Amino acid sequence: MATTVLIPDDDGLRAVSALDGVRAVRYEPGGPVPPGGADAEILVPGFLAGSAAAALAWELPKLRLIQLLTAGAEAWVGRIPEGVLLSTARGAHGASTAEWALTGLLTVYREFTEFAVAQREHRWTQHRTDTLHGKRVLIVGAGDLAAEMRRKLAPFDTPVTVVGTRARDGVHGVDELPDLIPHADAVILTVPVTSRTVGMVDADFLARMHDGAILVNAARGPVVRTEALLAELTARRLRAVLDVTDPEPLPADHPLWDAPGLLLTPHVGGSSRGSVERAYAVAVGEIQRYLAGEPLRNLVDGEY
């Protein structure tokens, strides 16, 4: 008997329909359970799906697996029926998000934003800029994104230090973080949102960063205390590159928009050409492992 999989879009329908032993059923995110969908054993929510998708999970009595298309699972942990497995698309977006972070650092150090303004104003502002070469980089978070970030920084001869929840080969434990922060020219956040990481970048964390250092948030907005960061930016002591904010989307009248020393993008780090295909490639692999009774590679265990 075929396993029913609920799919949110046509890209997924094509990808999952190619699997043997699967009956892929298209559903409209936010809409009711489609005909034939009530027997679904696997649910694939859409990108950045919200509360409506989470509510759908409770309407599927045979549901056993929720397969996400994102690396982040904070919207789902603790909010799904007991006994239902939760798997992410870790590995699908790391390369493009690391590319975003690298671009942000280069933009700040080489002053591309300032040169773009000068171009619009027809001003020839030739001068020396800073460089990423040789900068000391601290990556907070030791997952797929951190590994991609480390690879992309290698050609710039940047000493890279990685911090994870526990110490292991090539990774420092989080207990060492307070002593490592002051030595970093740039701090890149790649952690998931958990009870331990929400607000971890607070006033004390930022105060440990040396003058002129750059904070790069490639993680999630709630990891950073916005008011604390805004205070440091307003004082022109630190700089920042943000792809995520808290709140998000950022209200049009929020003071963060006009903060000096800030490069801000609207949560597009993983949004590049081919991102959907990469996410479904990971999802299909996880679904295949589930059907074969094999361990899932991206299974969320506890808070993850």
Which role does the model predict for each range below?
Residues 87-92, 96-100, 248-304:
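C-terminal helix-to-coil terminal segments
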Residues 115-148, 175:
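Glycine-rich NAD(P)-binding loop of Rossmann-like domains
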Residues 41-116:
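Phosphate/diphosphate ligand-binding glycine-rich loop within oxidoreductases
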Residues 1-45:
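N-terminal glycine-/charge-rich "phosphate-binding" loop or analogous flexible N-terminal tail
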Residues 155-170:
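NAD(P)-binding Rossmann-fold cofactor-contacting core
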Residues 166-255:
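Rossmann-like adenosine-cofactor binding region
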Residues 54-62, 78-82, 205-211, 232-236, ...:
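Short, conserved loop/helix-junction motifs that constitute active-site signature segments
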Residues 100, 104-128, 276-278, 282, ...:
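A charged, well-structured terminal subsegment
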